[in-house]
Amino acid sequence: MYRYLAKALLPSRAGTAALGSAANHSAALLGRSRGQPAAASQPGLALAARRHYSELVADREDDPNFFKMVEGFFDRGASIVEDKLVKDLRTQESEEQKRNRVRGILRIIKPCNHVLSLCFPIRRDDGSWEVIEGYRAQHSQHRTPCKGGIRYSTDVSVDEVKALASLMTYKCAVVDVPFGGAKAGVKINPKNYTENELEKITRRFTMELAKKGFIGPGVDVPAPDMNTGEREMSWIADTYASTIGHYDINAHACVTGKPISQGGIHGRISATGRGVFHGIENFINEASYMSILGMTPGFRDKTFVVQGFGNVGLHSMRYLHRFGAKCIAVGESDGSIWNPDGIDPKELEDFRLQHGSILGFPKAKPYEGSILEVDCDILIPAATEKQLTKSNAPRVKAKIIAEGANGPTTPEADRIFQERNILVIPDLYLNAGGVTVSYFEWLKNLNHVSYGRLTFKYERDSNYHLLMSVQESLERKFGKHGGTIPIVPTADFQDSISGASEKDIVHSALAYTMERSARQIMHTAMKYNLGLDLRTAAYVNAIEKVFKVYSEAGVTFT
């Protein structure tokens, strides 16, 4: 059964084409412009009406500075929520003083607080020496520790880590994870190094971060990102615990995404992709949004395309495939494949593991065009930033763009998608599954016990005692004894009453987190008459939450 967010009957995707010419009339009916609170009596109209796209994102070029791009999205959200923040202040100040306070705190939130630039030497296996360059950016300490991944890529730059760190701050706020944002990058192509050399680089980078106070369970907690995984996180944890943290009982909480044997958590590897699935699920099951797009709710009979077959792309593909959607194309850096009859994720994964590439997969054809422009219902960019730009946005045929990557859409592309009534599910919400489960892993490390261990047997026994009590009551009622009225649970119920494993708890908590955050975004989009502009709604929610922390904690030495 599918949900209806709005009470009013909403127009179809074809019908929304007329909304552009009727926008002024709709605004007159509502008595306000885009960004102003919606009238409570018109929820459907608030969702359906497409408003003028804000001009606050200043970069109108096709390849904007990544950090400036994120700041522009922040400015757009801040301009919408500023009046509410002023109104909600409970201080004995004049209106002007309150506004100055709000604007001051917003200026505190926006910049990146710390950026560490590192260079260190390593000796390679052939005896040569090489200087490695790396960065760690901490965007905000409004909550500690800071949290953000470490990526290995030759494209790493100061601008990139600053932008990704700021996105992490807002991402954590959107899903109510109490961390500040951070990000790290090491400027290497890991394919050019042996495992021994990568271990040297990772351990030395960890030591450099530790010497500068940029890693620690209560200070800054890295995680996997592009070209890093459990192996690298295990090296980081071991290096920290064996050196700086050798007296700290919580030392292994200095990093998340570790193997289970090193304090990791079940479900972390697939967390980001699973979060992408749940994020899409929450909007594709919302009948009011699907009505605007001219789509039926649910995954059944939907087609999707994945750009990037890494951790996020693979697991997103798995879950969408499992729930009835059909993947018709997959793109990687070395080429793309296409099959209108569908691509099986397990078969493609096995092929890539064996051959090192998706190219040549026997059940699909090579695709020569842009993977982003394939005709489909859902497009999942799960590669790198700034993939959807002003130049290719007009040719995108998908009705839903689900941002599995960080910053895949430039402001100009975002504007074009708004004008075309394409639903963009933003990165700061959609790919927050990774940091959500990282939070669970961090808590597990601090508690020094796995989820469910203390209650697993008790809950299982309690459930069976309950069933036995019901059975005995029925037998007494009908005068039958000795198990003649057996209570037999269904297979699904049997799994549930057997007790929740750590993976069950993690999956359930992640699904709830994504659902609750989606509800908040939908509510904000309606409240401020944002239509399909979910990105601005997500930024508004993030800004409100971060602002509240600064406002109530106070600002030291000002």
Swiss-Prot record:
Its main location: mitochondrion. Stoichiometry shows that ADP-ribosylation occurs in one subunit per catalytically active homohexamer. GO terms for molecular function: glutamate dehydrogenase (NAD+) activity; glutamate dehydrogenase (NADP+) activity. GO terms for biological process: glutamate catabolic process. It holds the Pfam family ELFV_dehydrog. One of its GO terms (cellular component) is mitochondrion. It catalyses: L-glutamate + NAD(+) + H2O = 2-oxoglutarate + NH4(+) + NADH + H(+); L-glutamate + NADP(+) + H2O = 2-oxoglutarate + NH4(+) + NADPH + H(+). Substrate binds at K84. Gene3D superfamilies: 1.10.287.140, Leucine Dehydrogenase, chain A, domain 1, NAD(P)-binding Rossmann-like Domain. PROSITE patterns: GLFV_DEHYDROGENASE (PS00074). Keywords: ADP-ribosylation, Mitochondrion, NADP, Oxidoreductase, Transit peptide. It comes from the Eukaryota. It is an enzyme of class 1 (oxidoreductase). SMART domains: ELFV_dehydrog. Residues 1-53 form a transit peptide. InterPro entries: Aminoacid_DH-like_N_sf, Glu/Leu/Phe/Val/Trp_DH, Glu/Leu/Phe/Val/Trp_DH_C, Glu/Leu/Phe/Val/Trp_DH_dimer, Glu/Leu/Phe/Val_DH_AS, NAD(P)-bd_dom_sf, NAD_bind_Glu_DH. The active site is at K183. The modification ADP-ribosylcysteine is found at C172. It is found in: Mitochondrion matrix. Its EC number is 1.4.1.3. Belongs to the Glu/Leu/Phe/Val dehydrogenases family. Homohexamer. PANTHER family: GLUTAMATE DEHYDROGENASE, GLUTAMATE DEHYDROGENASE 2, MITOCHONDRIAL. Important for recycling the chief excitatory neurotransmitter, glutamate, during neurotransmission. This is Glutamate dehydrogenase 2, mitochondrial.
